[in-house]
């Protein structure tokens, strides 16, 4: 919960988490050959008035995506938003966290509305590959320890490729996230989808005019001058 870390995370800096508990396991005689895993994530949603409005949906839970476990695919519906109208480009970001996505084992995939997602460091057939990546699709290298293979932990955020709005269309109100595998077993426990949406932004406008209708804002006036205040509203958002 946010309240656990609010008093600790008060400024920019380096924060270290330790002693995340996990039971001991052995891959040799464990039923699905995965052993045990543990990890943690801190997902922060912030407000920036300079950015376009977004619908942000987050899911926390736990699921096993496994061929041997009989659960090789999982569809997760996302709704409650409306994307921007045509012809504007639809922009979206996707954040995620999983356990046990092994680097050398292929077959794990992430799809959005039926389209495979990938980045330079996350191939479409080995998306969960024991790495920590950022919005630029490059690894996060200022970690400690800074191993290129986390041995079973994945977290990151990526820009959803959406050429010609072919993955997420204009005026869309829902999407489907699909996690699947044909080989590697992995355990997703968090994801979030942020989609640009239609949003008005009403700004109050105020103009001071003289008796002739001239704008006299910032000009000195004399005692007895007639002043007219013109109040209005201006929508600076993307909703008509």
Kindly give the residue locations of the regions a language model identified.
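Extended extracellular/luminal ectodomain segments enriched in beta-structured repeat modules
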Residues: 50-53, 83-94, 227
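A short "linker-to-beta-strand initiation" element
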Residues: 21-73
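Cysteine-clustered segments with highest specificity for TGF-beta superfamily mature ligands
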Residues: 1-33, 119-187
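Short beta-strands within extracellular/lumenal beta-sheet-rich domains
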Residues: 68-85
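Hydrophobic residues positioned within well-ordered beta-strands of beta-sheet architectures
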Residues: 40, 92-94, 175, 189, ...
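Low-complexity, serine/threonine/proline/glycine-rich extracellular segments that form mucin-like
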Residues: 96-98, 104-110, 232-240
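Exported/extracytosolic protein signature
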Residues: 197-240
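A short beta-turn/strand-edge loop motif at beta-sheet boundaries
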Residues: 50, 85-88, 102-104, 220, ...
């Amino acid at each position: 919960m946010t309240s656990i870390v609010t008093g600790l995370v008060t400024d920019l800096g380096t924060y270290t988490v330790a002693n995340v508990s996990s039971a001991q396991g052995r891959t040799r005689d464990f039923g699905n050959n995965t052993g045990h895993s543990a990890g943690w994530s801190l997902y922060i949603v912030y407000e920036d008035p300079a950015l376009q409005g977004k619908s942000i949906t987050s899911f926390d839970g736990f699921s096993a995506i496994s061929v041997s476990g009989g659960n090789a695919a999982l569809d997760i519906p996302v709704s409650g938003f409306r994307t921007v109208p045509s012809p504007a480009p639809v922009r979206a970001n996707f954040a995620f966290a999983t356990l046990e996505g092994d680097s050398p084992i292929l077959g794990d995939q992430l799809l959005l509305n039926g389209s495979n997602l990938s980045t330079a460091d996350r191939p479409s057939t080995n998306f969960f590959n024991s790495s920590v990546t950022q919005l630029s699709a490059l690894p996060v290298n200022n970690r400690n320890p800074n191993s290129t293979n986390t041995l079973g932990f994945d977290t990151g955020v990526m820009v959803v490729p959406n050429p010609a709005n072919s993955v997420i269309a204009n005026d869309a109100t829902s999407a489907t996230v699909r996690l699947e595998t044909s080989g590697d077993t992995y355990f997703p426990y968090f994801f979030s989808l942020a989609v640009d949406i239609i949003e008005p932004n009403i700004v109050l406008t105020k103009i001071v005019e003289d008796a002739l209708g001239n704008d006299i804002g910032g000009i000195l006036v004399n005692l007895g001058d007639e002043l007219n205040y013109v109040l209005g509203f201006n929508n600076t958002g993307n909703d008509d």
